[in-house]
C-alpha cells in the first residue's frame, strides 16, 4: 500500500520536473527567437523606408498635385531627372564640358551628380516619331518653330498624357471613335491621313468609298498626327502605311512625370482646349527665347518649382509600346 503511494508521488514529481523543464526550454527558445527578430529589425530599420500606400493619392481624381507624406524624402535624393534638348543647343554652346557645368549647377539645387541626365534629340520631327521618356521626371525643351506648330502641339498632347493603344487594319475594317477620349495616333516619317465618314448603309457622306481622292484630308506629310473625327460614325481611312503607322488609342489621363517647356515663339502652344485634357498649364510652360546657355540657367533656377507641379511615376514612355498601355 505504501509502495503504491510512494510510486504515485514519485511519478507526479518526475512529471512536474519534466514539465517545468519543457516550459523553461520553450521559454528560452521563444526568447531567443523574439530577441533575434528584434535585433534584425533594429539593424535593418535605418535601411528601410516606411511605406505609405496613400502617397500622392488624389482626393478628387486628379494626379496633377502632390500630397504631403511624412515619410517621403526630398525628391532629388531618390529620383532621376532627364532633360531633353535639341541638337542645336549643343551646337550653339560648343563646349565639351557644358554638361558637367550644368551638373554642378544642378547640384546647388539639391540634385546629386549623376541624378540628372541630358538627352539630345535631332529635332521635333524625329522626336515625335520615337519619343522615349525613361526617368522619374522628364523635362522636354522644345524651341518654337512656326513650320512645326502641328507636330509640337501634338507631341505635347502625346507625352503629357497616357494612352491605351491597339493596332488598326484599315484595309479590312471601318473604324469609329466612341467618345472624345478616343483618338487615332499616327507616327512615321511622312503621315498623310484621309477619312471618309459613312452612313448607316456604309455609303460615303460627301465622299466615295471607292475613290480616295474624294476623301477628306485631315493631315498632310506630318511626322505625328492625332486624328479626331465625329464620334459614333464609321469611317473608311486612307493612310500612307509605307511611311506611317496608325493606332486606335484611348486617352487615360495626364502623365504627371513629364513637363514641356516651349522656348520662344510669339504663339503659345496650348493643348488644354481639348475637353479630355485635364488642366495642365503647370506642366506646360514657356520661357522667352534667349541664348541656350541662358535657357539652361533658367531651367536650373526653377527646376524644383517645376518638379513640384509633377508627380513621380515609374512607367516609361516608348513609342514601340503604344500597342499596350503606355
UniProtKB/Swiss-Prot annotation:
Glycosylation sites: 69
InterPro entries xref list: VP7, VP7_1, VP7_2
Chain intervals for the UniProt region annotation (GPR motif): 253-255
GO CC entries: host cell endoplasmic reticulum lumen; T=13 icosahedral viral capsid; viral outer capsid
Principal localisation: virion
Gene Ontology MF terms in the entry: metal ion binding
Disulfide bonds: 82-135, 165-249, 191-244, 196-207
Signal peptide limits: 1-50
Pfam families, per the entry: VP7
Keyword Signal included in the entry's annotation: yes
Protein residues bound to Ca(2+) 1: 95, 206, 214, 216
Region (CNP motif) location: 165-167
Region described as LVD motif: spans on this chain: 237-239
Compartment list: Virion; Host endoplasmic reticulum lumen
Keyword set, alphabetical order: Calcium, Capsid protein, Disulfide bond, Glycoprotein, Host endoplasmic reticulum, Host-virus interaction, Metal-binding, Outer capsid protein, Signal, T=13 icosahedral capsid protein, Virion
Assembly with partners or alone: Homotrimer; disulfide-linked. 2 Ca(2+) ions bound at each subunit interface in the trimer hold the trimer together. Interacts with the intermediate capsid protein VP6. Interacts with the outer capsid protein VP5*.
Family membership noted in the UniProt record: Belongs to the rotavirus VP7 family.
Note, other: Some rotavirus strains are neuraminidase-sensitive and require sialic acid to attach to the cell surface. Some rotavirus strains are integrin-dependent. Some rotavirus strains depend on ganglioside for their entry into the host cell. Hsp70 also seems to be involved in the entry of some strains. In group A rotaviruses, VP7 defines the G serotype.
Name of the protein described by the UniProt record: Outer capsid glycoprotein VP7
Source species of the chain: Rotavirus A (isolate RVA/Dog/United States/K9/1981/G3P5A[3]) (RV-A)
Amino acid at each position: 500500500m505504501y509502495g503504491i503511494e510512494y510510486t504515485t508521488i514519485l511519478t507526479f514529481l518526475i512529471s512536474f520536473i519534466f514539465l517545468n523543464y519543457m516550459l523553461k526550454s520553450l521559454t528560452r527558445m521563444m526568447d531567443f527567437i523574439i530577441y533575434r527578430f528584434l535585433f534584425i529589425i533594429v539593424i535593418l530599420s535605418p535601411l528601410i523606408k516606411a511605406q505609405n500606400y496613400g502617397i500622392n493619392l488624389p482626393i478628387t481624381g486628379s494626379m496633377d498635385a502632390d500630397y504631403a507624406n511624412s515619410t517621403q524624402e526630398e525628391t532629388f535624393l531618390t529620383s532621376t531627372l532627364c532633360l531633353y534638348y535639341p541638337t542645336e543647343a549643343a551646337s550653339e554652346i560648343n563646349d565639351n564640358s557644358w554638361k558637367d557645368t550644368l551638373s554642378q549647377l544642378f547640384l546647388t539645387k539639391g540634385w546629386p551628380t549623376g541624378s540628372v541626365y541630358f538627352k539630345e534629340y535631332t529635332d521635333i520631327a524625329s522626336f515625335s516619331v520615337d519619343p522615349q521618356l525613361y526617368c522619374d521626371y522628364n523635362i522636354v525643351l522644345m524651341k518654337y518653330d512656326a513650320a512645326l506648330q502641328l507636330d509640337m502641339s501634338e507631341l505635347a498632347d502625346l507625352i503629357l498624357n497616357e494612352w491605351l493603344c491597339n493596332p488598326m487594319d484599315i484595309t479590312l475594317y471601318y473604324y469609329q471613335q466612341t467618345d472624345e477620349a478616343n483618338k487615332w495616333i499616327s507616327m512615321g516619317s511622312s503621315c498623310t491621313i484621309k477619312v471618309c465618314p459613312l452612313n448607316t448603309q456604309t455609303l460615303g457622306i460627301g465622299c466615295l468609298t471607292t475613290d480616295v481622292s474624294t476623301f477628306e484630308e485631315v493631315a498632310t506629310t506630318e511626322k505625328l498626327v492625332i486624328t479626331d473625327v465625329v464620334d459614333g460614325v464609321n469611317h473608311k481611312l486612307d493612310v500612307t502605311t509605307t511611311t506611317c503607322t496608325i493606332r486606335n488609342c484611348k486617352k487615360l489621363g495626364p502623365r504627371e512625370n513629364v513637363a514641356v517647356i516651349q522656348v520662344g515663339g510669339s504663339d503659345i502652344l496650348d493643348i488644354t482646349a481639348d475637353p479630355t485634357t485635364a488642366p495642365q498649364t503647370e506642366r506646360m510652360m514657356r520661357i522667352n527665347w534667349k541664348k541656350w546657355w541662358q535657357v539652361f540657367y533658367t531651367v536650373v533656377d526653377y527646376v524644383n518649382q517645376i518638379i513640384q507641379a509633377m508627380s513621380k511615376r515609374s512607367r516609361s514612355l516608348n513609342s514601340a509600346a503604344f500597342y499596350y498601355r503606355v
